[in-house]
Amino acid sequence: MTFAFANAVWLRGTYADVHPLGFAVALGAVALAVRWALRGDARALATGTVLAGAAVAIDNTTVLILLGGVVATLARRWPVAVVARSLAIAVLVVLAAYAYLPLRSAYVTVHRADPTLALGIPPGRPFWDDHHPSTPEGFRSLVAGTEWGPGETLVVLLTPAVLRRAADRFGAEVSADEPQGLLVVALIGLGFVIAQAPLAGVGLVLAAVVPALFGAAYPAEADPERYVLALYAVIALGVAVAADRTVRAFGRQKPAVALGVVCALLAVVSVRDVVRGHELFAYRDNPEASELGARVAAQTRDGAVVVAPWDWATALAYHAYVDRALGRRIVVCALPREHLEEYAAWMREHQVTIVSEGAPDLPGYSTRKLTGGSPQVYEIVKQ
């Protein structure tokens, strides 16, 4: 409960994103690694290895979490045959997932499935063919994020500057989500785990801390809080272990009373988190994305080019290519000036519009406001 209703976790459960799915699978793999460390269950080791492959196939940033799982498995000597078989399956899962990327990219390009190709935009734009991974450079860029330097981030991960940045970025929110001394309780619980099984405990700490440090340090990350999901999970585990030890220590005579008191205290924290995050209930009925799509459909001509930055282009692309509600309109994910030189050519065959909060400044062009609301839609016209 303390994990599920933490604001940072709950918020990321309200929308579709690959990262929480990858996190859940990776956390399952780490849990099985800890089970192997504590009990020597070879089936847990094999299943966890395959799950680790699935996690990397879903989202390659899960390797930051899985590092902790690898450390936990070192508590026992690996059974060579079991590890070899499960690792082979995991590698096949990863290869199959990543082989799909260039194959699909090549198909989209050959069949001109991406509508932006008709505008003369080179392959590699979001939604249909992000980074154009059918080329080696595009594949490396998409999978490894090479244009943003993740390697440089990893090199400085444990430096004092990154530690301070992580504390500044996540400290206040974590403290708000885990009040009334729960962080201290969690540390005590993790201390018990490390005392009982050092490598398993260290692995859990690494699984929690390494992704959070990366999220704080990576310059291209727009949503660093998604990297702290494992941190919240391990905090919840620490609280659970400490609660269990408390019940065992003080409940020898009246275990039901001790259990009831501990559960009541945790329930108070969970209720507080629910009240604190009550506004998140309204997110399921948030109409902003659908209203933007409706405004674009109502006030632009079929076949229009709709240029929008990422935050609004994603909603419009879903409206256009999933809901099929925008007809032949072409959604271009770009800043208003990014294709300034191409606008004249596009305007010969299309109405060209910009989604913007306020009239965009486009040298050589004027704009005509088509809609109200937030954001607005503007038509580009020649001066």
Where do the protein language model's features map onto the residues?
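Transmembrane helices and adjacent periplasmic/lumenal helix-loop junctions
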Residues: 8, 50-72, 97
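Membrane-interface transmembrane helices that cradle and orient dolichyl/undecaprenyl
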Residues: 27-47, 55, 73-77
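Hydrophobic alpha-helical membrane-interfacial segments at the cytosolic entry of transmembrane helices
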Residues: 49-51, 78-102, 116-125, 261-265
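Hydrophobic/aromatic-rich transmembrane helices and adjacent perimembrane loops
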Residues: 220-250
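Transmembrane alpha-helical segments
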Residues: 242-245, 259-284
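Luminal/periplasmic acceptor-recognition loop/helix of membrane-associated glycosyltransferases
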Residues: 307-310, 322-383
